[in-house]
Amino acid sequence: MNTESLALDFKSATLYAIRVVLHDADTTRLRAALDKRMADAGSFFENEPVVIDATRVDAPVDWPALLQALADHNLPPIGVVAEGANLQGARDAGLVPVELSTPVARAPQVIDTAPPNDVATPVPSVPEATAEAAAKAGPQDDEAYGEQADEAPAHNPESVPTRAARETTEANRPTATPPQSSSALVITKPLRSGQRVYARHTDLIVIGMVSQGAEVIADGNVHVYGPLRGKAMAGARGDTSARIFTTQLDAELLAVAGVYRVVEDKLDRALHNQPALVRLDGDTLRIEALKG
């Protein structure tokens, strides 16, 4: 028997990563935009692998400075999509050229003119979780939620400087959205600041308050029967039909299938602290009042 063949093997794999789309090559503006996006999102996007897309800029990128800015926010770059001199500069900085499963189009940017209170900008879905835990909390919190909840994967930021899109990079083919389980994960205690709950391949139901600084994430729908004051993400692996439901909307961040909105200002009076649902309409995040 050839023992060397048992030491390793090659398998095809799918890697979920942030595609950070550059619309400007100026280092100062890039860093400022990155700082703002990460400050808005808190820990949502930390430790996500990054693929940098520089196909929309012609000016030379300062690659070492950009890589340092990403490292300062715990965003490890794993590859680059670029052309010409920028591709060579990225190679010289140690980045590996990659191909995306979705071709990159150099189309002009479209400005969304929908009302600001019910729209958002597109960002990526989340990667496969590797740890199993109920929330980022102490032992008594883990015990309370049991083994049904996985630790939520880190999330992905809006781009530098304006938009980023989640792309699936794969050696052979894109993958389909994972199937949803029929059994929802139910949390019957309030979630405090710093706690994170992730429902893998299913819906998440929280009976109680989701406090500011807490995060609730599901591959299916998210239901919060209580005040939603933290961050909520439904359709975490790309299910565009997923929705967020809450009996009292006062969220910090809302996301469905990679389209997210940071709620910096109070919502319209008809939505703020009212029953509401959040859904996708194309690439636009819609926030609507729930009426009995």
Curated annotation (Swiss-Prot):
HAMAP family given in the database record: MinC (MF_00267)
Recorded coiled-coil stretches: none
Biased composition (Low complexity): 128-137
Biased composition range(s): Acidic residues: 140-150
Its biological purpose: Cell division inhibitor that blocks the formation of polar Z ring septums. Rapidly oscillates between the poles of the cell to destabilize FtsZ filaments that have formed before they mature into polar Z rings. Prevents FtsZ polymerization.
Protein keywords: Cell cycle, Cell division, Septation
Region (Disordered): 112-188
Quaternary structure note: Interacts with MinD and FtsZ.
Ranges of Polar residues composition bias in the record: 171-185
Gene name, Swiss-Prot/TrEMBL: minC
Family affiliation: Belongs to the MinC family.
InterPro entries linked to this entry: CAP/MinC_C, MinC, MinC_C_sf, MinC_N, Septum_form_inhib_MinC_C
Pfam families: MinC_C, MinC_N
Organism expressing this protein natively: Bordetella bronchiseptica (strain ATCC BAA-588 / NCTC 13252 / RB50)
Protein name: Probable septum site-determining protein MinC
One example of a Gene Ontology biological process annotation: division septum assembly
